[in-house]
Amino acid sequence: MFGTGRERMLWIAGALVLLAIMVVFLSAPAWTRHPNIPPQPAMSGMEGMDDMPDMPGMHMEVAAPAPTPEVLAKQLADKRESEFNHHLAGALMILAALFFLAQDRLSSRWPSARYAWAACLLFAGVFLLVFSDTEIWPFGYQSFLYAVTHNPEDAQHKTFAAILVALGVVATLRTSGRLRGWWSAWIFPVLALAGATMLLFHHHGGMHGPDAMQTMVRVQHQHLRFAGAGAGVAVAKGLADTSGKWQPFFNKLWPLFMIALGVMLLMYTE
Protein backbone atom coordinates (compact mmCIF):
# COMPACT_ATOMS: atom_id res chain seq x y z
CA MET A 1 0.00 0.00 0.00
CA PHE A 2 2.80 2.45 0.83
CA GLY A 3 4.88 1.87 -2.29
CA THR A 4 8.63 2.27 -2.34
CA GLY A 5 10.93 2.22 0.64
CA ARG A 6 11.21 6.01 0.53
CA GLU A 7 7.44 6.44 0.60
CA ARG A 8 7.19 3.95 3.42
CA MET A 9 9.75 5.89 5.45
CA LEU A 10 7.84 9.14 4.91
CA TRP A 11 4.60 7.55 6.13
CA ILE A 12 6.35 6.09 9.16
CA ALA A 13 7.93 9.47 9.93
CA GLY A 14 4.55 11.19 9.68
CA ALA A 15 2.92 8.61 11.91
CA LEU A 16 5.70 9.01 14.48
CA VAL A 17 5.25 12.80 14.48
CA LEU A 18 1.52 12.45 15.18
CA LEU A 19 2.22 9.80 17.82
CA ALA A 20 4.78 12.06 19.51
CA ILE A 21 2.27 14.93 19.57
CA MET A 22 -0.37 12.77 21.22
CA VAL A 23 2.14 11.34 23.72
CA VAL A 24 3.10 14.87 24.78
CA PHE A 25 -0.55 15.91 25.06
CA LEU A 26 -1.52 12.84 27.08
CA SER A 27 1.52 12.89 29.37
CA ALA A 28 0.52 16.15 31.01
CA PRO A 29 1.14 16.41 34.79
CA ALA A 30 -1.68 15.47 37.12
CA TRP A 31 -2.36 19.08 38.17
CA THR A 32 -3.31 19.99 34.58
CA ARG A 33 -6.14 17.45 34.62
CA HIS A 34 -8.05 19.51 37.19
CA PRO A 35 -6.63 23.02 36.76
CA ASN A 36 -7.53 25.70 39.24
CA ILE A 37 -9.21 28.15 36.91
CA PRO A 38 -10.24 31.26 38.86
CA PRO A 39 -13.88 32.33 38.49
CA GLN A 40 -14.82 35.65 36.99
CA PRO A 41 -14.37 38.43 39.57
CA ALA A 42 -17.52 39.28 41.47
CA MET A 43 -18.76 42.86 41.64
CA SER A 44 -17.81 44.03 45.08
CA GLY A 45 -20.56 45.54 47.16
CA MET A 46 -23.32 44.42 44.82
CA GLU A 47 -24.29 41.25 46.65
CA GLY A 48 -28.04 40.91 46.98
CA MET A 49 -28.84 43.16 44.04
CA ASP A 50 -30.45 40.21 42.27
CA ASP A 51 -33.01 40.02 45.09
CA MET A 52 -34.09 43.66 44.79
CA PRO A 53 -37.41 44.33 43.06
CA ASP A 54 -37.37 46.13 39.75
CA MET A 55 -37.85 49.88 40.05
CA PRO A 56 -40.10 51.48 37.40
CA GLY A 57 -38.19 53.73 35.06
CA MET A 58 -34.83 52.64 36.43
CA HIS A 59 -32.41 50.49 34.45
CA MET A 60 -29.69 48.91 36.51
CA GLU A 61 -26.39 48.81 34.63
CA VAL A 62 -23.51 47.67 36.77
CA ALA A 63 -20.08 48.23 35.30
CA ALA A 64 -17.74 45.27 35.41
CA PRO A 65 -14.49 45.82 37.28
CA ALA A 66 -11.67 47.11 35.11
CA PRO A 67 -9.42 44.26 33.94
CA THR A 68 -5.90 44.20 35.28
CA PRO A 69 -2.91 44.82 32.98
CA GLU A 70 -2.11 41.09 33.15
CA VAL A 71 -5.63 40.19 31.99
CA LEU A 72 -5.48 42.74 29.17
CA ALA A 73 -2.11 41.38 28.05
CA LYS A 74 -3.47 37.81 28.02
CA GLN A 75 -6.55 38.86 26.04
CA LEU A 76 -4.36 40.62 23.47
CA ALA A 77 -2.04 37.60 23.22
CA ASP A 78 -5.02 35.27 22.68
CA LYS A 79 -6.42 37.57 19.99
CA ARG A 80 -3.10 37.70 18.15
CA GLU A 81 -2.68 33.94 18.42
CA SER A 82 -6.13 33.28 16.99
CA GLU A 83 -5.68 35.72 14.13
CA PHE A 84 -2.23 34.34 13.29
CA ASN A 85 -3.58 30.78 13.17
CA HIS A 86 -6.37 31.85 10.81
CA HIS A 87 -3.96 33.80 8.61
CA LEU A 88 -1.47 30.93 8.41
CA ALA A 89 -4.25 28.48 7.53
CA GLY A 90 -5.45 30.90 4.85
CA ALA A 91 -1.99 31.25 3.32
CA LEU A 92 -1.59 27.47 3.20
CA MET A 93 -5.06 27.06 1.63
CA ILE A 94 -4.10 29.48 -1.13
CA LEU A 95 -0.74 27.79 -1.61
CA ALA A 96 -2.37 24.35 -1.78
CA ALA A 97 -4.83 25.53 -4.42
CA LEU A 98 -2.10 27.14 -6.52
CA PHE A 99 0.04 24.01 -6.31
CA PHE A 100 -2.93 21.92 -7.47
CA LEU A 101 -3.68 24.22 -10.40
CA ALA A 102 -0.03 24.17 -11.47
CA GLN A 103 0.70 20.53 -10.67
CA ASP A 104 0.79 19.31 -14.29
CA ARG A 105 3.36 21.90 -15.25
CA LEU A 106 5.41 21.49 -12.07
CA SER A 107 5.35 17.69 -11.96
CA SER A 108 6.73 17.49 -15.49
CA ARG A 109 9.98 18.86 -14.05
CA TRP A 110 9.69 17.76 -10.42
CA PRO A 111 7.48 14.65 -10.08
CA SER A 112 7.18 15.09 -6.32
CA ALA A 113 5.51 18.48 -6.86
CA ARG A 114 2.17 16.73 -7.37
CA TYR A 115 2.15 16.06 -3.62
CA ALA A 116 2.80 19.70 -2.70
CA TRP A 117 -0.86 20.68 -2.32
CA ALA A 118 -1.53 17.74 -0.02
CA ALA A 119 1.58 18.63 2.00
CA CYS A 120 0.17 22.13 2.58
CA LEU A 121 -2.98 20.64 4.10
CA LEU A 122 -0.92 18.27 6.25
CA PHE A 123 1.29 21.07 7.52
CA ALA A 124 -1.71 23.27 8.33
CA GLY A 125 -3.39 20.45 10.24
CA VAL A 126 -0.32 19.46 12.25
CA PHE A 127 0.50 23.09 13.08
CA LEU A 128 -3.01 23.81 14.34
CA LEU A 129 -3.14 20.52 16.21
CA VAL A 130 -0.06 21.58 18.17
CA PHE A 131 -0.23 25.35 18.42
CA SER A 132 -3.92 26.25 18.57
CA ASP A 133 -5.24 26.90 22.09
CA THR A 134 -1.98 27.35 23.96
CA GLU A 135 -3.70 27.05 27.31
CA ILE A 136 -3.26 23.31 26.69
CA TRP A 137 -0.20 21.48 28.03
CA PRO A 138 2.74 21.72 27.32
CA PHE A 139 2.21 25.45 26.64
CA GLY A 140 -0.44 26.08 29.28
CA TYR A 141 -2.10 24.86 32.43
CA GLN A 142 -4.82 22.52 31.08
CA SER A 143 -4.41 18.94 29.97
CA PHE A 144 -5.56 18.02 26.48
CA LEU A 145 -8.42 15.88 27.80
CA TYR A 146 -9.57 18.58 30.23
CA ALA A 147 -9.54 21.27 27.54
CA VAL A 148 -11.46 19.33 24.89
CA THR A 149 -14.06 18.11 27.39
CA HIS A 150 -14.60 21.46 29.14
CA ASN A 151 -14.13 24.00 26.34
CA PRO A 152 -16.18 23.51 23.15
CA GLU A 153 -13.96 26.00 21.29
CA ASP A 154 -10.82 23.95 22.02
CA ALA A 155 -12.56 20.73 20.98
CA GLN A 156 -13.70 22.28 17.71
CA HIS A 157 -10.25 23.70 16.93
CA LYS A 158 -8.62 20.30 17.42
CA THR A 159 -11.34 18.69 15.30
CA PHE A 160 -10.70 21.18 12.49
CA ALA A 161 -6.98 20.37 12.74
CA ALA A 162 -7.69 16.62 12.58
CA ILE A 163 -9.88 17.16 9.49
CA LEU A 164 -7.05 19.02 7.76
CA VAL A 165 -4.63 16.20 8.57
CA ALA A 166 -7.12 13.64 7.26
CA LEU A 167 -7.64 15.68 4.07
CA GLY A 168 -3.88 15.78 3.53
CA VAL A 169 -3.54 12.04 4.05
CA VAL A 170 -6.42 11.22 1.70
CA ALA A 171 -5.09 13.63 -0.94
CA THR A 172 -1.64 12.05 -0.73
CA LEU A 173 -2.98 8.50 -1.03
CA ARG A 174 -5.23 9.33 -3.98
CA THR A 175 -2.49 11.30 -5.75
CA SER A 176 -0.10 8.37 -5.40
CA GLY A 177 -2.74 5.91 -6.63
CA ARG A 178 -2.65 3.93 -3.37
CA LEU A 179 -6.31 4.71 -2.71
CA ARG A 180 -8.38 3.80 -5.76
CA GLY A 181 -11.79 2.58 -4.63
CA TRP A 182 -14.79 4.45 -6.04
CA TRP A 183 -15.82 5.31 -2.51
CA SER A 184 -12.48 6.99 -1.85
CA ALA A 185 -13.47 9.86 -4.15
CA TRP A 186 -16.06 10.90 -1.55
CA ILE A 187 -13.78 10.97 1.50
CA PHE A 188 -12.31 14.40 0.76
CA PRO A 189 -15.69 16.05 -0.05
CA VAL A 190 -17.40 14.52 2.99
CA LEU A 191 -14.63 15.63 5.34
CA ALA A 192 -14.57 19.12 3.82
CA LEU A 193 -18.35 19.40 4.10
CA ALA A 194 -18.19 18.23 7.72
CA GLY A 195 -15.70 20.99 8.49
CA ALA A 196 -17.86 23.59 6.73
CA THR A 197 -20.93 22.45 8.65
CA MET A 198 -19.07 22.66 11.96
CA LEU A 199 -18.30 26.31 11.20
CA LEU A 200 -22.03 27.04 11.34
CA PHE A 201 -22.00 25.99 15.00
CA HIS A 202 -18.50 27.14 15.93
CA HIS A 203 -18.30 28.35 19.51
CA HIS A 204 -16.02 31.36 19.87
CA GLY A 205 -15.47 32.75 23.34
CA GLY A 206 -13.05 35.24 24.77
CA MET A 207 -14.70 38.42 23.48
CA HIS A 208 -14.07 41.34 25.80
CA GLY A 209 -14.51 45.06 26.05
CA PRO A 210 -17.34 47.48 25.24
CA ASP A 211 -17.58 46.21 21.63
CA ALA A 212 -17.68 42.52 22.56
CA MET A 213 -21.17 41.97 21.12
CA GLN A 214 -20.35 43.65 17.81
CA THR A 215 -17.10 41.70 17.62
CA MET A 216 -18.94 38.42 18.19
CA VAL A 217 -21.44 39.23 15.43
CA ARG A 218 -18.60 40.10 13.04
CA VAL A 219 -16.77 36.85 13.85
CA GLN A 220 -19.95 34.83 13.31
CA HIS A 221 -20.49 36.47 9.92
CA GLN A 222 -16.92 35.61 8.96
CA HIS A 223 -17.52 31.99 9.97
CA LEU A 224 -20.63 31.89 7.78
CA ARG A 225 -18.57 33.04 4.81
CA PHE A 226 -15.91 30.43 5.63
CA ALA A 227 -18.63 27.78 5.70
CA GLY A 228 -19.98 28.85 2.32
CA ALA A 229 -16.56 28.70 0.68
CA GLY A 230 -15.80 25.38 2.38
CA ALA A 231 -19.06 23.91 1.12
CA GLY A 232 -18.12 25.10 -2.37
CA VAL A 233 -14.79 23.28 -2.08
CA ALA A 234 -16.53 20.10 -0.92
CA VAL A 235 -19.21 20.01 -3.63
CA ALA A 236 -16.91 21.01 -6.50
CA LYS A 237 -14.20 18.55 -5.39
CA GLY A 238 -16.74 15.74 -5.21
CA LEU A 239 -17.97 16.51 -8.72
CA ALA A 240 -14.40 16.80 -10.00
CA ASP A 241 -13.58 13.31 -8.76
CA THR A 242 -16.80 11.61 -9.90
CA SER A 243 -18.06 13.33 -13.07
CA GLY A 244 -16.36 12.49 -16.35
CA LYS A 245 -17.65 15.12 -18.79
CA TRP A 246 -17.38 18.07 -16.40
CA GLN A 247 -14.26 16.93 -14.59
CA PRO A 248 -11.89 19.51 -16.16
CA PHE A 249 -14.28 22.33 -15.21
CA PHE A 250 -14.71 21.22 -11.60
CA ASN A 251 -10.98 20.51 -11.30
CA LYS A 252 -10.47 24.22 -11.90
CA LEU A 253 -13.46 25.33 -9.84
CA TRP A 254 -12.77 23.71 -6.47
CA PRO A 255 -9.27 25.24 -6.11
CA LEU A 256 -10.85 28.65 -6.81
CA PHE A 257 -13.23 28.07 -3.89
CA MET A 258 -10.20 27.14 -1.79
CA ILE A 259 -8.41 30.33 -2.81
CA ALA A 260 -11.51 32.33 -1.84
CA LEU A 261 -11.54 30.57 1.54
CA GLY A 262 -7.84 31.29 1.99
CA VAL A 263 -8.28 34.99 1.20
CA MET A 264 -11.11 35.25 3.73
CA LEU A 265 -8.98 33.53 6.35
CA LEU A 266 -6.15 35.98 5.63
CA MET A 267 -8.59 38.85 6.24
CA TYR A 268 -9.91 37.38 9.51
CA THR A 269 -9.94 39.79 12.45
CA GLU A 270 -11.37 39.73 15.94
Predicted regions and their residues:
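Hydrophobic secretory-pathway targeting helix
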Residues: 1-33
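Transmembrane alpha-helical segments of multi-pass membrane proteins
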Residues: 14, 114-127, 182-198, 251-263
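Membrane-interface interhelical loops and short amphipathic "cap" helices
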Residues: 34-83, 134-153, 204-221, 270
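An N-terminus-focused feature that recognizes amino-terminal "leader" regions
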Residues: 75, 82-91, 117
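Hydrophobic cores of alpha-helical transmembrane segments in multi-pass inner/ER membrane proteins
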Residues: 89-99, 122, 156-172, 225-239, ...
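Juxtamembrane membrane-water interface segments of multi-pass membrane proteins
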Residues: 98-115, 135-141, 171-186, 204-213, ...
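Membrane-interface helix-loop-helix modules in multi-pass inner-membrane proteins
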Residues: 124-172, 200-207
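Juxtamembrane boundary at the C-terminal end of a transmembrane helix
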Residues: 264-270
